[in-house]
Amino acid sequence: MSNNQTLFERAQRTIPGGVNSPVRAFRSVGGTPRFVARAQGAYFWDADGKRYIDYIGSWGPMIVGHVHPDVLAAVQRVLADGFSFGAPTEAEIEIAEEICKLVPSIEQVRMVSSGTEATMSALRLARGFTGRSRIVKFEGCYHGHADSLLVKAGSGLLTFGNPTSAGVPADVAKHTTVLEYNNVAALEEAFAAFGGEIAAVIVEPVAGNMNLVRGTPEFLNALRALTAKHGAVLIFDEVMCGFRVALGGAQQHYGITPDLTCLGKVIGGGMPAAAFGGRGDIMSHLAPLGGVYQAGTLSGNPVAVAAGLATLRLIQAPGFHDALADKTRRLADGLAAEARAAGVPFSADAIGGMFGLYFTEQVPASFADVTKSDIERFNRFFHLMLDAGVYFAPSAYEAGFVSSAHDDATLDATLDAARRAFAALRA
């Protein structure tokens, strides 16, 4: 029995399903999860000592690769001064200033410890600001595991064939209206029917939790216009795409200014950190200034802030995002070319440092399109690549991530492995 198998059996005795986040369990793809022993750059090593090229990067945070020396040094510097204080620090001001500089729509920002906290708090704030209750979200967009957002939420729920989580009361779900992603007509109909009831519309401008699906400019511009017309708050959930598709996030890429933005992953540099922020007149409704309560014992944790600040400074290097986008596009185009050469129905897309792999002829534009993927073929491809030392997301419904540590050698090795994998799929 391998060390990975031994650890998984042991984990299942004390941890539900053996993992602390469902997609890690390999339930969708089958087989034994890889237990990570260490990581460096674009690679990680499992409990059996096997090395993998890593294309999940902790689900997005590791944009500069694992254990970047600048990030490591920043963390080591603050550790000697204390891990957590429950009182403000200068570093919290520094990261807030950095975020506001990089994302101009954010006039003020509040740090939290997870993307779920960020979206949950942003929705509460939008409701407090507008005095309304109804929330609009979109099929397949995952905004964390707060009850009102676990309705047709994609990602792990889609992986397990359950579009809406058990345990979400009907009285909570009734305040959430779910529309089709990229469907402008449905959006216009919803606002015509009950626009005055809508507190907020929350959207992933680049969705990464039903695989990678881009919001169309027409759709996102319609969102901006309709929310402004009806006095609803437009929330961009950029927990995944923030600082990845561009230095200023998807809102910079599309040239659209939301009212509130949720951030995470990259801003923690691999540590538990997230944030929400936006217009000053909305943020002023947060306690202690206003009546919308939000708090967190570990919010603005000094160790997480140190890792996040170091990462944010690294990604501001000239040409960083152009180089990252070029690598990611090379990977996506190369995989599509190998599949085409093997005669395997397949498509791929990339934006910034995110990519999507689809066992369909066309790149999907909606949740419904994503569900047409050939799951059995994806699962076989996943294991062929895993055996070859390439670690893609263990689900057909998750985006992938490239870091600045991925170089020509890692991309070449990935495409060589893919050539063999696609040939085996065709055989």
UniProtKB/Swiss-Prot annotation:
Modified residues (N6-(pyridoxal phosphate)lysine): 265
Cofactor(s) required, per the database record: pyridoxal 5'-phosphate
EC number: 5.4.3.8
Compartments, as annotated in UniProt: Cytoplasm
This protein's pathway: Porphyrin-containing compound metabolism; protoporphyrin-IX biosynthesis; 5-aminolevulinate from L-glutamyl-tRNA(Glu): step 2/2
Catalytic activity entry: (S)-4-amino-5-oxopentanoate = 5-aminolevulinate
Single GO molecular function: pyridoxal phosphate binding
HAMAP family: HemL_aminotrans_3 (MF_00375)
Family named by the database record: Belongs to the class-III pyridoxal-phosphate-dependent aminotransferase family. HemL subfamily.
Name assigned to this protein: Glutamate-1-semialdehyde 2,1-aminomutase
High-level lineage: Bacteria, Pseudomonadati, Pseudomonadota, Betaproteobacteria, Burkholderiales
